[in-house]
Amino acid sequence: MSDSPAGALAAELTWTGERFEAGVRLEIGADGRLARLVRPGGGPTAGSDAAPARPLPRRALLPGFVNAHSHAFQRGLRGLGETSAAPGGDFWSWRAEMYGLVGRIDRDRLFDLSLGAFREMRAAGITSVGEFHYLHHEDPDARDFAFDEVVLAAAAEAPIRIVLLVACYAAGGPGRPLEGAQRRFAVDTPDELWRQVDRLGGRLADPSTQSLGAVAHSLRAVPPEAVAGLRSEARRRGVPLHLHVEEQRREIDECVAAYGKRPMELLLELGAGGGDEPLAGTTAVHCTHTRPEELARFVEAGGRICVCPLTEASLGDGIPPLAAALERSPAVAGALCLGTDSNARISMAEEARWLEYGQRLAGEWRGVLRDRAGRVAPTLLAAATSGGAAALGLPTGEIAAGRPADLVALDLDHPALAVATPAALLEAFLFGAGDDAIAATALAGRWSAGRPGRAVAPAERTLLA
């Protein structure tokens, strides 16, 4: 990986927000940000002695992908939980397997699992991750929060841009205490969470690529009044708040029994009377069984929706009713982001295609997430980039002046892309290619190769030297 990000690049094609353009020069400052973009015929760069751009022939640049929802430690379950002695396996039977891992894990194992997950994300084009982190304590009796800094250390080594979303997890369900392995998750109150956030804020391994946010694990695990307190303080601090919402029907049933309302109803009540976009900065993860009209209201109140298609399929959760929600509010499409969640498979391109494919299967029609031009791929790319950045409060997700130079380089000679025209390249990648079409990624202008063992083209050797 190169030591200095400064310099200029000119790939064969660069995504500039609506299309791929040829010959765009990207000038990257010493701070790892894009100083300017210069299109062919766009005039001279600042200063007559501007260095020539390093050409990247047969490469196309995209913004680095933003993974808005991850549980890195769950990579340790890969290959497990896929055997059922009888029909009827579901999220809850998988969760029992996950709790077994939680009970066994120590700092070294957590570091290795997190590092492996983050490196795999980089190879899949993911340059930023929102780590929804509730596995806090090595010693639950001491409430040591020993695992929080382990995850940050793994992210720094990978390296990957991370927002550590520190979770409040107070109960095993409404009115039920945490038991067994769950005790490693324990953060009882918003005050305890914010004290830990403040402590971690002074210990970030790299403040330029690491930041913090808050989580209410769910309205099963955190009572509504505590969620309200977390939301209020998160808004005051200007940090994101994420929570699982209506992934499982049992979650809905338990909340109705305890509080008389569904989780999304409770969440919408928190935003009532809060002025314009009272739920801005709040991201609801999954929303698998959320009523379409409530999804639309949540988005109109400023909320964002994180869908994790591969994990939701793996666990048999279901498919969120996005098509019906879009009929009620077209703004839903622009509020979407994506996550790899359980990390059973790490591929943002595949998450993006299944965001659309799941809706096609559910509704038996195509083009559910199409934009005004009738294209689906730009909506999917936005969910995988700028949508995730907005959900995490990051300045990433676009190739634009002033943004970090977090980039993905596609190999235009890859068999899945070689016949695609520039006008169809995004569709060819998202619907027809795998992560092996990713040649390299850049984090703040510093490049790393794609998949381990992948051949490095001569054009990239100077970047990766």
Language model segments and positions:
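N-terminal metal-binding scaffold of metallo-dependent hydrolase/deaminase domains
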Residues: 1-48, 60-61, 446
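A conserved active-site cap/scaffold subdomain adjacent to cofactor or substrate pockets
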Residues: 290-293, 299-329, 334-340
